[in-house]
């Protein structure tokens, strides 16, 4: 941390980035869980889906805080264009570029989720596969760019996050595929057969 930055900006940027990564981990695990229909026996599917959506919204909020504080912090020196386009600028262009690519994937996920009632299942599902790409990009961004990436507490959180996602995705990829309805519409909203 340099003299050009204020401690609250710096800590808010770091903290919101870590919280966003943890929430994105939960979103991926819950997303995989909804495709596998993981849930307690007495919990309707729409509850699991609502939790997935709610945590997704919270993750996007913390991601927005992370981005805004990075933009206003003079020490971070992040430009607006760098947030969405991986550019070879600044001291860590590769790691910042991974964050930009992750944000782009997350933006596509949010947009298609908001428009899911107007999209075919195939389109929505194809774009939703970006979730599997956005998480490792965000994870690598945090490991490479984060000022806490060499601390024991961060490495423990990162290891737990990686383990949770690897277990969920591994289970998803090794499990049997289930058919989906032609259109998402009411099946996802009501917890009906999907």
Task: Name every feature range the model reports, one short phrase each.
Residues 1-194:
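Membrane-embedded alpha-helical bundles that constitute the cytochrome b-like, heme-associated redox core
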């Amino acid at each position: 941390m340099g003299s050009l930055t204020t401690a609250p900006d710096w800590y808010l940027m770091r903290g919101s980035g870590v919280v966003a990564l943890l929430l994105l981990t939960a979103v991926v695990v819950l997303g995989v869980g909804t495709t596998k229909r993981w849930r307690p026996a007495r919990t309707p599917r729409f509850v699991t889906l609502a939790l997935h959506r709610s945590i997704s919204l919270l993750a996007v909020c913390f991601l927005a805080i992370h981005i805004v504080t990075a933009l206003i912090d003079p020490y971070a020196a992040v430009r607006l264009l760098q947030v969405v386009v991986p550019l070879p600028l600044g001291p860590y262009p590769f790691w910042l570029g991974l964050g930009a690519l992750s944000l782009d994937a997350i933006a596509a996920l949010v947009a298609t989720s908001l428009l899911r009632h107007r999209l075919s299942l195939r389109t929505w599902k194809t774009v939703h596969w970006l979730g599997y790409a956005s998480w490792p990009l965000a994870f690598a961004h945090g490991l490479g760019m984060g000022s806490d990436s060499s601390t024991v507490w961060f490495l423990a959180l990162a290891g737990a996050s990686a383990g949770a996602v690897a277990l969920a995705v591994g289970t998803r990829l090794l499990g049997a595929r289930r058919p989906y309805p032609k259109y998402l519409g009411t099946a996802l909203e009501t917890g009906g057969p999907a």
